[in-house]
Regions:
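Accessory "access/gating" subregions that flank catalytic or transport cores
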Residues: 205-344, 452-460
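Extended hydrophobic packing segments that form well-structured cores
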Residues: 424-460
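Conserved phosphate/anionic-ligand binding catalytic regions in large, soluble enzymes, centered on
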Residues: 9-27, 283-302, 343-354
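Hydrophobic alpha-helical bundle architecture
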Residues: 313, 324, 330-403, 415-424
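C-terminal regulatory domains involved in ligand/effector binding and gene-expression control
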Residues: 77-258
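Short alpha-helical scaffolding segments that buttress acidic/His motifs in well-ordered protein cores
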Residues: 8, 12, 270-278, 321-329, ...
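Alpha-helical support elements that line or immediately flank enzyme active sites
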Residues: 18-35, 300-312, 357-365
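Short, mixed-charge aromatic SLiMs
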Residues: 44-59, 91-98, 321-334, 376-389, ...
C-alpha cells in the first residue's frame, strides 16, 4: 500500500473529515461511478442513503446529511464553494427534489430517503453508509456500501473486507511501513525523512508538482487562519459558541507592549492560530485535513509558529515540515487509525500533535532520531484521549483541544531536541499502544456523543 502526502493533506470543508468530507466523496462517487458511468443515471427515480454507527449518532451535528445531499448532486469537497451550500440545501428541502450529478432531477424526501440508523453498525467500521438507487418500478439499479475511515479517506465494502485503505501498489524507491523501517531507509540512503518522502512522491508527480502542491496546501492553511481571525459571530448549532479568534487577535495587536512583559505571549499566538482554524472548520469553512478536520488546527498553528517566530524560517523549512509530518501520519494510517470513531480523539488530535512535533523538529534541523522521538512524545501523552463532542458538534471540546495539541507539539519538539534522540519508548511501540487502547475503548467514547463530556454537559 502506498500513501501520498496529498492523501493525508487534502483541501476540503468542515466540520469533519470523516463525517463531512468522506460522506460527500462517497455519495459523489456512487452517483458518478455506479449510476452515470454504468449508464443508468437517467433511469433513476429514487435514491436512498442510510447512515450507520457514528455517522448516525453524530451525523447531524457534523453535517453528514448536508454532505450526502451535495455529493448526490455531484459536488466534491475540494471543489465546492462553501458559501453555496446553504442555498443548495434550501432548494433541495423546499422543492423536495434533488439533481443527481447536477443534471438528473428526481423527487427526494429527506425524511424517508436519508435514514440515520442508530441501531445498526455495518461490519467493518463505525462510519458506514449505504446508497441505493431505484427505477420507477421500484427495482434496484445499484447499491453500494462505503466506509469513511478517517481523514476523508473512503473505502467501499470490498476494500474494507480485505482490510485495504487505498488500492495503490505503486513501487516506491524508499518503501516503509514502520518507524524502524523509515529510520533504516534514511540511514541507508543518507537522506532525511523529508527527502525520503520527497523521493517517494516522485513516483506519482514531478518535483515541481510536489513543491507546488505542498505550497498550495500551506497557502490554504494560511488562508484558513486569516479567515478565522477575521470572521465574527456565533458558530452554527445549538451550543451557541462565540468565535474567539477575532477578539484575541485584536487584543494581541492592540497591546504589543504586553509581550515584552510576558515571555509566554508566543503561546497566545499559537493558541490563536489553532482556534482560528477550528472555528472556521466548525462553521463549515474550507480547511485542510491534517490529518483530519477535527484536528485541522494543530499543524497549521505549529507551522505558523515556525514561519512567524523562528528566526531564519524558510520556504524549504515549510516543505520539510509537511513532508516529515506526512511520513509520520502514514505510519499511524497504516498501523493504527486516524478516525475518532475508531480509536477516539487520540487518533485525531493525538496523531496531529505527533505529526506536528516531528515536522517542527525536522524544520529546525533535528536529526531523524530526534524527529522520531518528538513524534513519539507527541502521541505518548495523548494516549487514551476520548472523542466526546457535546451535541455531536465539532466545537466543545474540539476547538480548544486543538490549541492544547499545538502547544504540546511545540513542547515535544523542544524536549526531543534537548536530547540526542535516544529514548526508551519507540514511535512504533506508541503507535501500537494507541491502536490497542482504541480497540479497548468503549464505543460511547468514540464520536457517538453517548459518553464523557457529551452526557455530562447539557446542550442548551
Amino acid at each position: 500500500m502506498a500513501v501520498s502526502v496529498f492523501d493525508l493533506f487534502k483541501i476540503g470543508i468542515g466540520p469533519s473529515s470523516s463525517h463531512t468530507v468522506g460522506p460527500m466523496r462517497a455519495a459523489a462517487r456512487f452517483v458518478s461511478r455506479w449510476l452515470d458511468e454504468k449508464g443508468v443515471l437517467t433511469r433513476v427515480a429514487r435514491v436512498r442513503g442510510e447512515l450507520f454507527g457514528s455517522l448516525a449518532h453524530t451525523g447531524r451535528g457534523h453535517g453528514t446529511d448536508k454532505a450526502v445531499l451535495c455529493g448526490f448532486e455531484g459536488e466534491w469537497p475540494d471543489k465546492i464553494d462553501p458559501d453555496t451550500i446553504p442555498g443548495r440545501l434550501e432548494r433541495i428541502r423546499a422543492s423536495k427534489n434533488i439533481r443527481l450529478l447536477g443534471r438528473h432531477e428526481i423527487a427526494f424526501d429527506e425524511k424517508s430517503d436519508l435514514i440515520f440508523n442508530k441501531r445498526t453498525k455495518l461490519p467493518y467500521h463505525s462510519n458506514g453508509m449505504r446508497f441505493t438507487a431505484y427505477d420507477t418500478a421500484g427495482n434496484e439499479l445499484a447499491t453500494r456500501d462505503y466506509y469513511s475511515v478517517g481523514g476523508g479517506f473512503v473505502v467501499n465494502h470490498d476494500e474494507a473486507a480485505e482490510d485495504r485503505i487505498v488500492a495503490d501498489t505503486t513501487a516506491l524507491p524508499h518503501p516503509f511501513h514502520t518507524g524502524d523501517q523509515l529510520l533504516k531507509a534514511c540511514d541507508e540512503s543518507g537522506k532525511s525523512i523529508a527527502q525520503v518522502m520527497f523521493e517517494n512522491e516522485k513516483a506519482w508527480r514531478s518535483e515541481s508538482e510536489i513543491r507546488s502542491g505542498l505550497l498550495t496546501i500551506w497557502k490554504a492553511m494560511q488562508d484558513c487562519v486569516a479567515r478565522g481571525m477575521r470572521e465574527t459571530g456565533v458558530l452554527p448549532g445549538g451550543l451557541k459558541v462565540q468565535r474567539r479568534a477575532p477578539a484575541m487577535v485584536k487584543d494581541l495587536c492592540d497591546r504589543p507592549e504586553a509581550s515584552l512583559k510576558d515571555p509566554l505571549t508566543i503561546l497566545d499566538w499559537v493558541n490563536l492560530y489553532a482556534l482560528a482554524v477550528n472555528e472556521e472548520n466548525a462553521a463549515g469553512g474550507r480547511v485542510v485535513t491534517a490529518p483530519t478536520n477535527g484536528a485541522a488546527g494543530i499543524i497549521p498553528a505549529v507551522l505558523h509558529y515556525y514561519h512567524r517566530f523562528v528566526p531564519g524560517a524558510t520556504e524549504q523549512g515549510v516543505l520539510d515540515f509537511l513532508l516529515t509530518a506526512a511520513a509520520i501520519g502514514i505510519l499511524y494510517k497504516e498501523n493504527a487509525s486516524i478516525s475518532g470513531a475508531e480509536v477516539g480523539c487520540q487518533g485525531e488530535v493525538g496523531v496531529a500533535c505527533s505529526m506536528a512535533a516531528g515536522g517542527l523538529t525536522a524544520a529546525l534541523g533535528g536529526s531523524i532520531y530526534q524527529v522520531e522521538n518528538a513524534a513519539e512524545i507527541g502521541m505518548e501523552h495523548n494516549l487514551g484521549l476520548t472523542c466526546d463532542p457535546i451535541g455531536g458538534l465539532v466545537q466543545i471540546p474540539c476547538i480548544e483541544r486543538n490549541a492544547m495539541g499545538a502547544v504540546k507539539a511545540i513542547n515535544a519538539q523542544r524536549m526531543a531536541m534537548r536530547g540526542d534522540g535516544k529514548h526508551r519508548v519507540s514511535l512504533d511501540k506508541v503507535i501500537k499502544t494507541m491502536r490497542d487502547t482504541g480497540r479497548d475503548m468503549q464505543d460511547k467514547y468514540k464520536e457517538t456523543s453517548r459518553g464523557g463530556l457529551a452526557v455530562n454537559v447539557i446542550e442548551c
